[in-house]
């Protein structure tokens, strides 16, 4: 029962061919000249088919691992969850820690241009905790937990073995108390160990730091992950590679044999201004990332706006300039208060204090040579022109490739301009920076690119399609007692015929009770499906493109036909609150809710254990519904005791191939996800009523002030735009550029790449008038790309998964080694962007239609705003802006119909 993770209004949410049936039991992995294997989600279960769901069987966690190891890991995880049942709130992000160094992995010194190094696991790795680096924790306990993961990035003949290959176990060992309280980068060990999550005890080396910061805590554990060789951080190799990082292949002797692993050095180990001498054939310097800087580096220029997404202060309020990067911030906007138990520095931003990287393919503001800031896009190292890779900063730690995004007239055939800049000179683009654009044209471009990336940014995270940890035939009680009801009727019904006990003439069926077992003595009884654990043969489990797994009809299902029982753990109110609170504490935006209210304070939760019914998705326009019935338990002197169960039944005819859906009808819990079913009557929530805004005591006064201020703001915006339009008709100022204004009509809209393209040859005489505009000069670190044609291959730039492919003709020493796994990665074509309607805040002229802050709702609002309607009205969309650490900022966008 997965909430939609994408735009549910799309037509491509049908089951995918080839993913409908799950494979059978897996055999232990044997390494025999294997170059590639399909990646298996760490912690995801595996099902044979819907026929196997009548067994109470636990799904394997790592399909390639030996079964005895899987069984042992399951028992260890259950024992840990039983011992540490109380969920610990680590007070993140208010209190956090730095990323712990890997003291037990010794890496030999290497130079900035070397791609290989030697490593060795020290003897202390088997006896000390990787967090506190001690044998005993603060309470004096010396018990160590062994990580259930495996070393990432194993290579063979110069190629990375794709997939999670359980060949070499992770060497991390840790105290339970140390790992539970370790929350660097939003890591939450206790939450990841839950049976509905990863169901294993994993250290941070198996969790993508970028996905975790973006609150995608299920995607963080799947896919190809690269470990940092110097600290307990890891990143998805292709989709979340940190800008400013560099690769390092580490050779480690394991079992008497040298094994090579592809790792990275993350940009958190970059020291600005460090005394670094490069490769010399007579003398090799020490590892560049371990050298102490000469002195504190003072940044010469900063972005004069707060870098915190949730900033609510005026743009004119005074900001603090970060001493280690180009960002500025308000002291009250920072969420982090203490780091390693000490107050954070007053003159550093959160990103520098916590070492948060910027993923590649992210919109940024980057500093130009004249200390001005321009819109750019971070790129992979190997998107940089081959002929210019001799640059001294190419693949250097702390530097990244950026492509400048500047509008130009009639430059469709010209190539983009790229630079190599230090990561301390870039900052992720936020709405707070829009006011810094030098003119309206640049501001429009910044806003347009920001909206484009906002719709696709998190799609870079691996798509997760998980199965249930354990399968149940019927529901079971979890730490609560059944609330049985007595039914004073011991007589068997008088139903006859082949379809007996299917009509309301059956006294048990009419009272919503199942027949007692003795009814089967008269013939086949059709009113005992729930007790017998029957699942309709007309349904199948299938993976969708945007909603995880779903349940589809493989034959016509008639109205009122029984489908299956909704199976799970039956929990009470206290346990329900505890489970929902743990999701809120963990800040997991991918958490799925499988709870269905039963009766008298009891709830069925299918998150950990269940059957195929847990995969039935929610819809505000369903074709099935949940019903309550009473099932026979035992006889008494006066009658029989019955228990309450819930089951799914069709409420209209369901054709072959249609997805089966029903309305969850949950109470309006604050921490439940929004509905994304995409139905015309979507209520915006999975609850029983439409989600309304909370009322305040002085709501009328605040509303009046808000309307008044919005009117003034609207008039000011119109005046400002008219003035800028007049200025654009005349000569521009020297500090501004005057490119053509991007079109907003769907007919003439251009792709991301076409608007961002840069000419191969430029008329420098015409550009000298605009002194602040980037120009390619001889001897600078800039170069124009001549071999990469982004107009023919826009997916190389726009794909949420970077290709990271090496050019064979590279002149750098790194290109001389064997080809890596990047040569085999294919880029994906980006989705076609539709024209965005006006986002002006206007006065409401009719009935306002409210939608939740979801992609499907925004898509629907945009569609409505372009339709011809008899009486114009305003379409409101509530949008959530989420900061790096989870602060949620809600705003309302209004689309004026055309």
From Swiss-Prot:
PROSITE patterns cross-referenced by the UniProt entry: POST_SET (PS50868), SET (PS50280)
Summary of the knockout phenotype? Derepression of X-linked genes in the germline. RNAi-mediated knockdown results in sterility. RNAi-mediated knockdown suppresses the multivulval phenotype of the lin-15A/B n765 mutant. RNAi-mediated knockdown at 25 degrees Celsius rescues the larval lethality phenotype of the mep-1 (q660) single mutants.
Q: Which GO terms describe its cellular component?
A: autosome; chromatin; chromosome; nuclear chromosome; nucleus; X chromosome
Annotated SET domain ranges read: 537-665
Q: Where is the composition biased (Basic residues)?
A: 705-719
Q: What class of enzyme is it?
A: transferase
Keywords for the protein's UniProt record, in alphabetical order:
Chromatin regulator, Chromosome, Developmental protein, Metal-binding, Methyltransferase, Nucleus, Repeat, S-adenosyl-L-methionine, Transferase, Zinc, Zinc-finger
Task: Please list the residue ranges annotated as the Post-SET domain.
Answer: 671-687
Give the main localization category: nucleus
Q: Which SUPFAM superfamilies match?
A: SET domain
Q: Where is the composition biased (Basic and acidic residues)?
A: 692-704
The compartments listed are: Nucleus; Chromosome
- Stretches with biased composition (Polar residues): 36-51, 774-788
Q: What is the effect of changing residue 206 to Y?
A: In bn67; suppresses the multivulval phenotype of the lin-15A/B n765 mutant
CDD domains assigned: SET_SETD2-like (cd10531)
Which GO terms label this protein's molecular function in UniProt? histone H3K36 dimethyltransferase activity; histone H3K36 methyltransferase activity; histone methyltransferase activity; zinc ion binding
ZnF start-end (PHD-type)? 126-214, 303-355
Q: Low complexity compositional bias: what residue ranges?
A: 737-751, 761-773, 802-811
Enzyme Commission number: 2.1.1.357
Q: In which tissues is it expressed?
A: In adults, it is predominantly expressed in the germline, and weakly expressed in intestinal cells.
Q: Name one Pfam family in it.
A: SET
Q: Which InterPro entries match?
A: Post-SET_dom, SET2_Histone-Lys_MeTrsfase, SET_dom, SET_dom_sf
Identify its protein family.
Belongs to the class V-like SAM-binding methyltransferase superfamily. Histone-lysine methyltransferase family. SET2 subfamily.
| Record PANTHER family | SET DOMAIN PROTEINS
User: What is the role of the protein in this entry?
Assistant: Histone methyltransferase. Dimethylates 'Lys-36' of histone H3, a specific tag for epigenetic transcriptional activation. Plays a central role in early development and is responsible for all H3 'Lys-36' dimethylation until about the 40-cell stage. Indirectly involved in the global inactivation of the X chromosomes in germline cells, possibly by excluding the mes-2-mes-3-mes-6 repressive Polycomb complex from the autosomes. Not related to transcription elongation. Required for small-RNA-induced H3K27 trimethylation. May suppress sensitivity to RNAi.
Q: What is this protein called?
A: Histone-lysine N-methyltransferase mes-4
Q: Which organism is it from?
A: Caenorhabditis elegans
> Source taxonomy lineage?
Eukaryota, Metazoa, Ecdysozoa, Nematoda, Chromadorea
The encoding gene? mes-4
